[in-house]
Amino acid sequence: MKFSHVFLGLLVTSMPSVASDNFNWLRDDSRQDERVLSYLKQQNQKTEQFQKRYDEITQNLLSQWESMAAEKGEKPWAIKNGQEWNLTRRQGNFVLLSRAYNNAQEKVVYDFSFRQEERQYFQIGQWRIQGDSLLFTEDIDGSEQYRAVLVDLKSGAARELISNIDNGVLLSPNAKFALVVSKEAKTQRPYQIVRINTQTNEQKVLWQEDKTDWLMSFYPAADARFALVQSNNESTTEQKILNLDSGELTASLRKPESGVEYYADVAQDRVFLNSNLNGQFGLFETAMPEKDVDTAESNWKSFLRSENGVEQFYLYDAGLVALTKQNNQTTISVYSYDGKEKKSLPLESEGRVAWLSTLGDYRSNKIRIRSMSMTTPPLWEEFDVKVLTKTNLSQDIYHGFSSQDYVSQRIMVKSQGVEVPVSLAYRKDKLSDNAPVVLYGYGAYGFTMKPYFMPQTVSLLDQGVIYAIAHVRGGGYFGADWHEQGRGVLKANSINDFTAAAQALKHFDGGERDVYAIGSSAGGTLVAGSINQAPDLFAGAVMKVPFVDVVASMSDTTLPLTAQQYGEWGNPTLPEQLKAMQAYDPILNIHKDAYPPMLVQVGLNDQRVPYWEGAKYLAQISSTSESTGPYLLQTDFHSGHRMDPRQAREQQAKEYAFLLSLIKTSKAEQ
């Protein structure tokens, strides 16, 4: 429920920097400067020319992935009002399906293909349906400047309600009103909750947040009559309850207090909240607030406390479901609404990661569980909150693949006296003393990069690669404290952990191995920072939309989502924090050395990490490195922070092929 907008905009700063001095001309906010576009196209031509050398590897990967196509277990459909719904892709295009509950004949509710096929980038944000009205948000250029579209399913007529909004959308039960979050024109900060009359297009601002380091958002309540609207920064929350039909907004559930977070939901005319009011997150309950009367803190009654806090909760007709963690094991517990525990069971099974998917609405009493490991195909299970039983729904089957041929394990590496977990996998009969390592990392915002099962990763294992994920500080592997140890002035800890993981994996199992790195977005900070620390530790790297110009990005609060990110990256207006940021900033720390080969991918319309960050970074590497690379820049002129799903697989094949070509060359030289 917490906001996850990150990396909107790059900012010019007066900080002295060779990189900035030499390559600031690559920044073009209009994305129309012919000199810049010509440079990016020339770099693409250079990259495409080099990629021809290993085109056979790229095509082989695509063929392997195609031949390994799974007999997919059906993903559970969303349950709403006794109907099942599924937004899926067919031949690459989005289509919305529905059926009666329990696997009746499906029907096409809406086919997005005509909207999608005429564009080189197309992404759906969220969709809602009430009766014959379908409301969705769409991004048509990768800029994440969504627009809301209302469709009359009887006639098929579609019309745009509003543009330059966030991706979220809600539709009132009577379908007469839409709810969106409008963005500031210049900064793209989500700052207004806007209610739109779907018949007249009349707009009304329900709540505007003027504090520049706060963001606005909303989510539906378990009780379909309501939504929770909120404003929050990195550590503080303010929420109100909205009646979707009437548009009536309650007073704040609790006035904002620095460091106090709470996330509420509504059921049975009561409000339940997960809050760190008393330190650890715990569940509280209170009565529905009146319109103009603030909820007194004294009216919050404790509902559930746990030694390590409550991670999340969900409300169903049959009870409240809570997730807690003990010894890094997550537990699902079901409680009656009078607070009595009805059932408790582990979320994960041995060796697998698992997470909940709330695809069932309040009355369905169904919650879905997705689980897998790096070498075990995905499994869908369903937990019935009413009868308290768990059943298998489906599992992906990969013919010719046997989990017994592979090893998936977790090791601990020491970094500055701290034990850092690393998930890794390899194929048993391919493990040799010089088997190379591909190391992936992210390490920010408290996100945990789960060790997913992916055919693409398995194809690397089949070619003798050890694939690893470093769960560095700054991520969420060990909870909130693990995040705190790698954010702000402690951000360098994330990079130190990644370097320590690479050093340990270089000699994993007594071997002498080449290490290759992959990182996306904040993971680019991690990889680029680690390469600055030890360029000779890495044999190659792939960075996708990398956040590498940190001090510059965080030095101008007038541009997108800068002040909101001080807690994560540091505040350059404070001398001590600026010093810490300068110490890890990837561009500021490029120096004369033999940097490894790199492939950097950027999206021209990216509003989170603008294209010029990666372009400036690689230009500086190319001009400074004492090695010959190659240093390849690839710009997607039709996407932003994410690539269009229709091109994503081919792009991933090119990235893996780049690394495999380096591995092949290295082995030939040994």
Identify the function of each model-found stretch.
Residues 13-17:
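N-terminal signal peptide c-region/cleavage motif recognized by signal peptidases
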Residues 37-127, 137, 209, 214-232, ...:
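Non-catalytic accessory segments flanking enzyme active sites
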Residues 101-103, 152-156, 197-201, 243-247, ...:
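Short loop/turn segments that connect beta-strands within beta-propeller blades
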Residues 110-126, 135-138, 142-184, 191-194, ...:
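Asp-box/WD-like beta-propeller blade repeats and closely related beta-sheet repeat scaffolds
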Residues 114-125, 142, 184, 394-516, ...:
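Cap/lid segment of the alpha/beta-hydrolase catalytic domain
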Residues 128-130, 172-174, 221, 267, ...:
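Structural WD40 beta-propeller signal
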Residues 167, 171-241:
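Solenoidal tandem-repeat scaffolds enriched in leucines and small polar residues
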Residues 472-670:
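Active-site-proximal cap/loop segments of hydrolase catalytic domains
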